[in-house]
């Protein structure tokens, strides 16, 4: 059974505190937009789809609380301004993740249109917001399962031409249930392969410096009893070079895909794409359409978040033998005191290194001109 990282029911929101994983599984309450902002900024929740969902739901919880307390204005214009201000605030928690900005824009548009509707009130606006927020959670899970099915089919069709019924896959960072409403994007593809008895082995990278692969992806893989092996980031080249490894594909997620296919994802993704190209391994990006930013022409325009030097120079975990005791978490220094640190959270993989982008509407490959064209994905009249 897949993990449930986000629990939302009866206008109550809880998330797994991912800072404590894999040692302690604890759900923490999110009671306001401010709580949501801090959870995202502090990486208690991460993964582009999950960030957007938690942000939107955190405001839903706050609006519900205001309404229950009898403090909600009857004016839809006044409530609308409050919601829009909170949405803008939430976007500042993680500027690289396009899903968050995209969700905020959509909800802002919904709010603006609702306030112009005849008979609109503060109460009706909040009701509309809550309904859309809940649908967002449902749709993300459905989209992820479609991504998984499309991606698994694409990989297996190509593996079959080489006589392979089962495949080995490499993934980076965490793109599973912990990064989404459930099931996952890139890890959803791997999960679909496993469910179809077509996964021989998945390799997951440690994903320095924040160790999302070692802490989170490995946690999910062990939880679901998938055949899995953890490697450090620097071992990927050696893995691909081993004839017996037979890695069919590298599948990663995305925080933002530019209009030309350039993809911002966790630092280290670009290096894996270069390795894949050299070794003739398919390199795939798995992401919902909300991650595709058609307003950003290329990766050159993507803002890359830089994080604290301490994430590189220190590491946090429990003392060996005391796993499970949250009070025994220790921070250990790894690097020489005084060394300068550069710590970008993401890098941009050029579209030229990406073989395909897997979405909930299907797999997009480059056209005859050698470029990605995503417009058809957004044509609601076209079939999936």
Curated annotation (Swiss-Prot):
EC number(s) for this protein? 5.3.1.23
InterPro entries membership: IF-2B-related (IPR000649), IF-M1Pi (IPR005251), IF_2B-like_C (IPR042529), Initiation_fac_2B_a/b/d (IPR011559), M1Pi_N (IPR027363), NagB/RpiA_transferase-like (IPR037171)
Principal location listed in the UniProt entry: cytoplasm
**Any GO molecular function:** S-methyl-5-thioribose-1-phosphate isomerase activity
Is Cytoplasm a UniProt keyword of this protein? yes
Q: Which residues form the active site?
A: 255 (proton donor)
Report the record's Gene Ontology biological process terms. Answer: L-methionine salvage from methylthioadenosine
Q: Which transformation does this protein catalyse, written as a reaction? A: 5-(methylsulfanyl)-alpha-D-ribose 1-phosphate = 5-(methylsulfanyl)-D-ribulose 1-phosphate
Q: Where does the record say this protein resides?
A: Cytoplasm; Nucleus
Pfam families with a match to the protein in the record = IF-2B
What would be one Gene Ontology cellular-component term for the protein?
Answer: nucleus
Site positions for Transition state stabilizer = 173
| Keyword Nucleus appears in the UniProt entry | yes
The lineage's top-level taxon is Eukaryota
> Which UniProt keywords are present, listed alphabetically?
Amino-acid biosynthesis, Cytoplasm, Isomerase, Methionine biosynthesis, Nucleus
Pathway membership: Amino-acid biosynthesis; L-methionine biosynthesis via salvage pathway; L-methionine from S-methyl-5-thio-alpha-D-ribose 1-phosphate: step 1/6
In which family does this protein belong, per the annotation? Answer: Belongs to the eIF-2B alpha/beta/delta subunits family. MtnA subfamily.
This chain's function reads: Catalyzes the interconversion of methylthioribose-1-phosphate (MTR-1-P) into methylthioribulose-1-phosphate (MTRu-1-P).
Query: Which NCBIfam families does the UniProt record give?
Result: eIF-2B_rel, PRK05720.1, salvage_mtnA
Query: Know the name of this protein?
Result: Methylthioribose-1-phosphate isomerase
Q: Which organism is it from?
A: Talaromyces marneffei (strain ATCC 18224 / CBS 334.59 / QM 7333)
Q: What's the name of its gene? A: mri1
């Amino acid at each position: 059974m897949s993990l449930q990282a986000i629990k939302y029911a009866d206008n109550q929101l809880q998330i797994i505190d991912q800072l404590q994983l894999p040692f302690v599984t604890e759900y923490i309450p999110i009671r306001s937009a401010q709580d949501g902002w801090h959870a995202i900024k502090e990486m208690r929740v991460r993964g582009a789809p999950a960030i957007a969902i938690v942000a939107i739901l955190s405001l839903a919880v706050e609006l519900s609380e205001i309404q229950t307390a009898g403090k909600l204005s009857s004016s839809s214009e006044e409530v609308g301004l409050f919601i829009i201000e909170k949405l803008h605030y939430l976007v500042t928690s993680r500027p690289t993740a396009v899903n968050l900005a995209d969700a905020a824009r959509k909800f802002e548009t919904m709010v603006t249109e609702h306030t112009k509707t005849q008979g609109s009130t503060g109460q009706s606006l909040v009701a509309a917001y809550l309904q859309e927020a809940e649908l967002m959670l449902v749709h993300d899970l459905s989209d992820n399962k479609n991504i998984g099915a499309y991606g698994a089919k694409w990989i297996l069709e190509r593996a079959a031409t080489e006589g392979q019924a089962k495949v080995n896959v490499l993934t980076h960072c965490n793109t599973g249930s912990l990064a989404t409403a459930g099931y996952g994007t890139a890890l959803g593809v791997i999960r679909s392969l496993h469910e179809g008895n077509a996964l021989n082995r998945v390799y997951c990278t440690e994903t320095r410096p924040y160790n999302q692969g070692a802490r989170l992806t490995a946690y999910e893989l062990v939880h679901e009893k998938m055949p899995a092996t953890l490697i450090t980031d620097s071992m990927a080249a050696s893995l691909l070079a081993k004839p017996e490894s037979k890695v069919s594909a590298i599948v990663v997620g995305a925080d933002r895909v530019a209009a030309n296919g350039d993809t911002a994802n966790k630092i280290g993704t670009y290096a894996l794409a270069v390795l894949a190209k050299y070794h003739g391994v398919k390199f795939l990006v798995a992401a919902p359409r909300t991650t595709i930013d058609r307003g950003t022409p290329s990766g050159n325009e993507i803002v890359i978040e830089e994080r604290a030097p301490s994430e590189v120079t220190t590491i946090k975990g429990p003392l060996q033998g005391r796993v499970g005791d949250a009070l025994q978490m220790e921070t250990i220094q790894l690097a020489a005191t005084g060394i300068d640190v550069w710590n970008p959270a993401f890098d941009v993989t050029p579209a030229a290194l990406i073989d395909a982008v897997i979405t909930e509407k299907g797999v997009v490959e480059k056209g005859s001109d050698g470029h990605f064209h995503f417009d058809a994905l957004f044509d609601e009249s076209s079939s999936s």
